[in-house]
């Protein structure tokens, strides 16, 4: 439902007010402490759960392409981020982790993550993750100082930006 709501109401870079609010509300409803307008960026946010010393960042993108809507799948990235963080949150204290969801606006040409990085958003994170849809049936992982992973997806591959007819 979250992915569909975002898809039905696309907002472009730095204008993702309703999208950011939907995501903040979804995370708050799941027990996350939410900070809007994170680090002075109006459509960025931070949502946290747990209080462990190991900090895990989950990035959520939610801006749309001008004239194309969510052809790059940022509605999926955002919904997956909420799902991953929501699955980890109930285990956070037991695992000794803090789950941090970073709402990263303006990823379609606006450099939202760069702005957040420059403002210190990701300082001290032990791990940062994000899922992104793509045009092929493989998971490509480029980990730094971690083991490679192999994931099998079943279904038909399609990417709205690369293969809109599929």
Please place each PLM-identified region on the residue numbering:
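Histidine/acidic-residue-rich, glycine-tolerant segments that coordinate divalent metal ions
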Residues: 43-48, 63-71, 75-76, 95-166
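Acidic/His- and Gly-rich active-site-bordering loop/insert found
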Residues: 1-97
């Amino acid at each position: 439902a979250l992915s569909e709501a975002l898809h039905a109401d696309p907002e472009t870079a730095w204008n993702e007010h309703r999208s950011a609010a939907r995501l903040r509300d979804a995370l708050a409803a799941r027990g996350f402490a939410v900070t809007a307008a994170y680090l002075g960026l109006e459509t960025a946010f931070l949502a946290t759960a747990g209080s462990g010393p190991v900090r895990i960042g989950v990035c959520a993108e939610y801006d749309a392409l001008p004239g194309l809507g969510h052809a790059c799948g940022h509605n999926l990235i955002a919904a997956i981020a909420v799902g991953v963080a929501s699955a980890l949150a109930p285990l956070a204290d037991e695992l000794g982790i803090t789950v941090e969801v970073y709402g990263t606006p303006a990823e379609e040409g606006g450099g939202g993550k760069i702005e957040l990085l420059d403002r210190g958003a990701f300082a001290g994170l032990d791990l940062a993750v994000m899922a992104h849809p793509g045009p092929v049936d493989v998971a490509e992982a480029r980990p730094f100082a971690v083991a490679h992973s192999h994931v099998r997806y079943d279904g038909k591959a399609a990417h709205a930006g690369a293969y809109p007819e599929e």
